Design a protein with these regions (language model features):
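Contiguous segments within soluble domain cores/interaction surfaces
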Residues: 1-124, 128-146
């Protein structure tokens, strides 16, 4: 498991906990393969080189506003410079509905010093959705019912 070599904000009391990082990536439900994962009722899910959460609050609290549309995207290979692009596709709709989202660095940080993108993943309607995050070489695919 690669340990990220990113700098925390100047003066930050945080430090990356390498053991917690490794454990997090090895134990989060999902797959290390680059394929779509059904989120189901799980809160944090891994697909490829991304872990995304909190799906539970996102789904239960959704009302179409940015305030209730926050998801954290944790890349396996953060570098501190790469933007995050998320393609959200409403599955089973005609015509197909696609929302393209773009989020730049800087990251936010967990208490364990793990970098993540904070986003307002605003989706316009309920239904079955596929999220495909891409940041540099990191990719993932998550399907869930909103």
């Amino acid at each position: 498991m690669p340990i990220p070599q990113v700098s925390l904000p100047n003066g930050s009391p945080l430090a990356l906990d390498a053991a917690a990082w490794t454990r997090f990536w090895r134990t989060t439900p999902g797959t290390a393969r680059n394929r779509c994962v059904d989120v189901g009722n799980r809160d944090a899910v891994r697909s490829g080189e991304f872990i995304v959460s909190p799906f539970t609050a996102f789904i239960q609290g959704w009302d179409g506003t940015e305030e209730t549309s926050k998801l954290a995207y944790i890349p396996l290979h953060p570098d501190g410079r790469t933007s995050l692009d998320v393609t959200a596709t409403r599955l089973g709709s005609e015509p197909q509905l696609t929302v393209n989202l773009h989020f730049g660095p800087p990251y936010s940080w967990t208490e364990d010093g793990m970098p993540f993108y904070v986003t307002g993943t605003v989706l316009p309607e309920r239904g079955l959705w596929r999220l495909e995050p891409v940041a540099g070489r990191d990719r993932g695919c998550f399907e869930f019912r909103l």
